[in-house]
Amino acid sequence: VIVTRGIKREYDMGGEIVRALRGIDLAIARNEYVAIMGPSGSGKSTLMNIIGCLDTPNGGEYWLNGQMVSTMSDDQLARVRNKEIGFVFQTFNLLPRATALHNVELPLVYAGMGSDERRRRAKEALAKVQLEDRMDHRPNELSGGQRQRVAIARALVNNPSMLLADEPTGNLDSATSEEIMKVFENLAGSGQTVVMVTHEPDIAAHARRVVVLRDGLISTDDSREAFAARHGL
C-alpha cells in the first residue's frame, strides 16, 4: 500500500529552516496494522500528513497503491484522499444534529451516491464497529467511545485502502481507549490496512508493528512483541 523513499520535509520558520523529516524509508503492506509513534517534534504528524496526502515532501518519493503521489497537484491529491484514505481524528468531527447513520452517510452524499445505496453502505460500516443498534441516535445521545466508533464507520464507508488514525484515543479515558483499540484490532483482523499515529506506548503496543520516530528519522521499527519488550509493556 505505502512505500516512502528518502522522504524529507523542511519548513522555513521566519528564516530558520526546520527539518521535520530527514529521510524516511518506510514500507507498509496491504492488511498491516502499524502504529507510528514518537514524542512531540519527532516528525510523526508531518509524516502522517504526507501519508494522508494532506501535504507533500520537499524530497524523496511517496508511492500509494502504485501511484507516485509525492509530485501530484492539490486536485490530484484530493482525489486520492477521497478514494484511498479513511481518516479518524481524536476530535470526532460529527454533525451534532445528524444521526449516527447520517453522519456515516455524509462522504457518500458528497460523492453523489443514491440514497438507497448510501443507507446500505452506512449500515454496513456501522455494523463493522458494532454500532448498528445506535444508528438513529445523535452524537449527544452517545458515549465518547460510541462517537469515535461512528467516526471510524464514516472513515470506512468509502471502502478505503487505508484507515489513517491520528491520536484516535486522545480524548478518551483508558477503558474507552481499550474499547476503540479492540475495534481497530477487529478491523485489522478482517483485512483492513490500519495506520495509527500516537505518542502513547501502551496504545501503540496494540498494533502488530510499531515504527518509532525521533528527530525526523526512524529510530526503531519493531514487531508488537519486540516493542512491548523494549518498553516493558
Language model region names:
Residues 1-218:
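ABC family nucleotide-binding domain
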